[in-house]
């Protein structure tokens, strides 16, 4: 029998992996009624590398759902045009007839309500040069959206000034073009304290800071300040959520850096730690605890650091089987953190369960702090976003064009111990 060529072996491996992924997906789909209170699966025309819920929520009179918007992008091929996109999402109200035991096979959703179609609608497309690496809205005015592009420039759009359907000439007309970088990247963060202050990290090892309220010339704006300290790609940047002068950055040099704009030498970080044994891809400051920051790395771990003693990590989460690309804290629950990796899984962690006692059977499923694994995606998850209005609802996008909006079942995060009791004798 002739020996298989390397190409044939690779093809066989890919086929086996695809079959395995499909089997895993079928098992996941069968179990969704027990694991989720809500799942909406929507196939986008093109994959989105970015997703973020907008902060506004409306309840149309006489309807059984609320309406929210989210920001998406496209990553097209074959010279197809790219867009920054706004989607409108219908989510069931708590008292709507939503039965998670009913999984609609045709529309791949549970917790369905009303008509099965039209839960997710693209309501605006804005022409964009190349794919949208990341898009984030400005907290003080959610009409303003910054995008990381495939060029060195960062774009700023006011989507209220753009038509819902893009001009057919394909021309991209951002309201501002921000200059300072020499190459593309992903890191992007708006200050919640100073309106218009935007941080960006890129592959050129630089961090740029702009004030978009400053006077621009011909719709272009130079950086207010450039920080160069990382040795290699700056993968992510984030403003601190309690202290207006502090921000953090992580990069391929394995380092987590903390910067203070009040520092006499503001071109140097005030703290620096080799956070991981591989490239650090993402960071997130805890919105409730001013000292806690989470990082995710190519070394497949998520780590927690305390800014008061940053030299050693507080805790390491190491259940991911692939590189970790994104971390994000729940906006409603101080101890809840999510992370996603190259391996198609999004994990939700509960810090309050660290070091809890486990039965041997439970220990086989992972450490006590691993609260939930979302297994609904069949390819790499590019980004996810916690819903700021609906507790425990997450949107996630993957490379196979799929957008999922989901909420784990309440009994997963509410232990029997957590249920309030009216019996004073049973109260702790």
UniProtKB/Swiss-Prot annotation:
Pfam families: CAF1C_H4-bd, WD40. It is found in: Nucleus. One of its GO terms (cellular component) is chromatin silencing complex. Coiled coil: none annotated. Its main location: nucleus. GO terms for molecular function: histone binding. One of its GO terms (biological process) is seed coat development. The keyword Nucleus applies. It comes from the Eukaryota. WD repeats lie at residues 127-167, 180-220, 229-269, 275-315, 319-359, 376-416. PROSITE patterns: WD_REPEATS_1, WD_REPEATS_2, WD_REPEATS_REGION. Keywords: Chaperone, Chromatin regulator, DNA damage, DNA recombination, DNA repair, DNA replication, Nucleus, Repeat, Transcription, Transcription regulation, WD repeat. Belongs to the WD repeat RBAP46/RBAP48/MSI1 family. Core histone-binding subunit that may target chromatin assembly factors, chromatin remodeling factors and histone deacetylases to their histone substrates in a manner that is regulated by nucleosomal DNA. Component of several complexes which regulate chromatin metabolism such as the chromatin assembly factor 1 (CAF-1) complex, which is required for chromatin assembly following DNA replication and DNA repair. PANTHER family: WD40 REPEAT FAMILY. Component of the chromatin assembly factor 1 (CAF-1) complex, composed of FSM (FAS1), FAS2 and MSI1. This is Histone-binding protein MSI1. It comes from Oryza sativa subsp. japonica (Rice).
């Amino acid at each position: 029998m002739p020996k298989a060529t390397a190409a044939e072996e690779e093809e066989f491996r890919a086929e086996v992996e695809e079959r395995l992924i499909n089997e895993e997906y079928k098992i996941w789909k069968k179990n969704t009624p027990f694991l989720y209170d809500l799942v909406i699966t929507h196939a986008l025309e093109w994959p989105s590398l970015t997703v973020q819920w907008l902060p506004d929520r409306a309840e149309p009179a006489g309807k059984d759902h609320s309406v929210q918007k989210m920001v998406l992008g496209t990553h097209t091929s074959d010279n197809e045009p790219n867009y920054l996109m706004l989607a409108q999402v219908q989510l069931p109200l708590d008292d709507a007839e939503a039965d998670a035991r009913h999984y609609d096979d045709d529309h791949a959703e549970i917790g369905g309500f009303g008509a099965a179609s039209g839960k997710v609608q693209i309501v605006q497309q804005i022409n964009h040069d190349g794919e949208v690496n990341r898009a984030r809205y400005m907290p003080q005015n959610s009409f303003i959206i910054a995008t990381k592009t495939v060029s060195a420039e960062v774009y700023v759009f006011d989507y209220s000034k753009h038509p819902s359907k893009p001009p057919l000439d394909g021309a991209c007309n951002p309201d501002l073009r921000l200059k300072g970088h020499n190459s593309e990247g992903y890191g992007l963060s708006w200050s919640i304290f100073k309106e218009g202050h935007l941080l960006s990290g890129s592959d050129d090892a630089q961090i740029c800071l702009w004030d978009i309220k400053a006077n621009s010339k011909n719709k272009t704006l130079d950086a207010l300040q450039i920080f160069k300290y990382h040795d290699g790609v700056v993968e992510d940047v984030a403003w601190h959520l309690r202290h207006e002068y502090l921000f953090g950055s992580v990069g391929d040099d394995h380092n987590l850096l903390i910067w203070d704009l009040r520092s006499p030498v503001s071109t140097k970080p005030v703290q620096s730690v080799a956070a991981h044994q591989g490239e650090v891809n993402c960071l997130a400051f805890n919105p409730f605890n001013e000292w806690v920051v989470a990082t995710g790395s190519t070394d497949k771990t998520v780590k927690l650091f305390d800014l008061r003693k940053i030299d050693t990590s507080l805790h390491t989460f190491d259940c991911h089987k692939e590189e970790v690309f994104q971390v994000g804290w729940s906006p409603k629950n101080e101890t809840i953190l999510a992370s996603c990796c190259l391996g198609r899984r999004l994990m939700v962690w509960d810090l309050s369960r660290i070091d809890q006692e486990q039965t041997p059977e439970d220990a086989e499923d992972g450490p006590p702090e691993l609260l939930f694994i979302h297994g609904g995606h069949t390819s790499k998850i590019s980004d996810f976003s916690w819903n700021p209005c609906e507790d425990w609802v997450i949107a996630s996008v993957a490379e196979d064009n799929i957008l999922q909006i989901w909420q784990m079942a309440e009994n997963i995060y509410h232990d029997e111990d957590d249920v309030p009791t009216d019996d004073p004798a049973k109260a702790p």
